[in-house]
């Protein structure tokens, strides 16, 4: 009988230890969850702090973009009106190319007009060595796969240029330039004629703020909301 009591007593002690161990593990899990939440909150506060230090958060990017839109030109409204007659009229005028370039920069697609300008400059080359150097420069910058400012060309056009780049002629980029010109005429040019940059030139209207800053503020607000919710956990 005494042996039985000792046996059951031993079982009770084991059960008590198991319960105590379970409670410790359960409590440790909660503590670990709270620590992870605090770490996440701290990381998000750090990200928000870095974001607040960025110049564009305070509107400098917006300011520079607005300055780009409002850049003054000496072109008259009468001359600017002619640019709406055709894309060729726009490209034939230096101020037209400049205004169109500024517009494309607001759409982050200025590589097209830069390629067109580079081709125009290339066709003015008179020395063979200069022709080769400029041809390679254009190829490296605009044509080859993964070029820093690669333009949208079909495979055949790119292949022809690639094969002739070692011995270029003044017409090596004609097909590519024509292709890019068509893309701009049927796409970007139509939007340019409705843009603030062009309307400002022909009407002298005040520039409306671009929506670039609003996007930045929306992003910042979302970041702040995440941090705010995690700070509540922290507290």
Curated annotation (Swiss-Prot):
It comes from Rattus norvegicus. One of its GO terms (biological process) is G protein-coupled receptor signaling pathway. This is Regulator of G-protein signaling 18. Keywords: Cytoplasm, Phosphoprotein, Signal transduction inhibitor. GO terms for cellular component: cytoplasm. The modification Phosphoserine is found at residues 49, 216, 218. It is found in: Cytoplasm. InterPro entries: RGS, RGS_sf, RGS_subdom1/3, RGS_subdomain_2. The lineage of its organism: Eukaryota, Metazoa, Chordata, Craniata, Vertebrata. Residues 86-202 form the RGS domain. Its main location: cytoplasm. The gene is Rgs18. Pfam families: RGS (PF00615). Inhibits signal transduction by increasing the GTPase activity of G protein alpha subunits thereby driving them into their inactive GDP-bound form. Binds to G(i) alpha-1, G(i) alpha-2, G(i) alpha-3 and G(q) alpha. GO terms for molecular function: GTPase activator activity.
